[in-house]
Amino acid sequence: MTTMRTWFFTEDCYPDLPPQDEWDSIRVELPNQLCEPENAHRLYNEYLDIWCAADEMGLDIMVNEHHQTATCMVPAAPIMLGILARQTKDARLLILGNPLPNRNQPVRVAEEMALIDVISKGRLECGFVRSVPYEAAAANILPYKGSERLWESHDLIMKAWTTHDGPFNFEGKYYHHRQVNIWPRPYQDPHPPVWITTGGASSTDPVAKHGHVAAIFLAGYSRVRPIFDAYRENYLKHHGTHAPLDRLAYCGLVYVGDDEKAAEKGANELMWYMQANKVSDVPRLRATCPGDTSPKPMRLQGLSPLKGSTRQWGQKPYFSTK
């Protein structure tokens, strides 16, 4: 019988911001002069204490990363996970995840994750994500063919984790590595469980083929159901058996209040934060990058893959050096 596991997650936001009418967006473009180091020091330690408390209460732990944003002060999730690997005792440690298309050294990712797995004595759950479109320019990478780069990077990491008879070379379309022979190797054999985020039914096939966990964020039932159904169908197609229940993961937003009235008030404020965090207000941030979305689903929504947001993506000052 499969037991449902519950993961505690906080995105480590920086809450002390100026009035909202004084800024366009709290992602990518908000000047870091607004981030007071002493305050950030306090917040980091507070968030680490909360994660450790979650471990003591029997919850598993999830961390993520984003870049140049007040919504998430963790630009390097492996560092936070390394701290938690030493400070916690029982919790499974999920990173969701490593933005592989934005990482030019997949072998480095394999090394970092293996190190965390060994320090934690095999408690790592390793997630891979494509990243979000508005962080592509900040990462100095082209968003084109992000899914292809993710899966090629994934293949190199898996090979690095599972090859134990000496160095190998890797020649891919996007990545080329020599003398790959990571130390240490993962604690878990053959490797830590892998999670992949998915935002549509069409992206579930490779996740199901590999038997990885498919995870969904910020989506209601009407969107989640067809994605989960597609994963189950693809898993059955590839493996000849039904997908275990623990192959599907969902991130929900939860607010707890002392009573119904307080809970409703807090939940409404939470929804306001999610909907008004100033991404949608800036065209160049909400833009769909070239190659980020397949033309087929865009056409099904009545959108042109060659117009609108694609032009916005390349407009200045998004790629400006000034």
List where the protein language model places each region.
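N-terminal beta1-alpha1-beta2 module of alpha/beta enzyme domains
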Residues: 1-91, 192
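An alpha-helical appendage that flanks or caps ligand/catalytic pockets
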Residues: 2, 8-35, 147-183, 223-322
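Hydrophobic faces of well-ordered beta-strands that scaffold small-molecule active sites
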Residues: 6-10, 61-64, 93-97, 124-128, ...
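Glycine-rich anion/phosphate-binding loops
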Residues: 41-44, 101-115, 321
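Generic structural signal for well-ordered alpha-helices
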Residues: 47-51, 78-82, 110-114, 151-158, ...
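Conserved, mostly hydrophobic/aromatic
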Residues: 54, 65, 84, 116, ...
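A conserved active-site cap/scaffold subdomain adjacent to cofactor or substrate pockets
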Residues: 197-223, 227-228
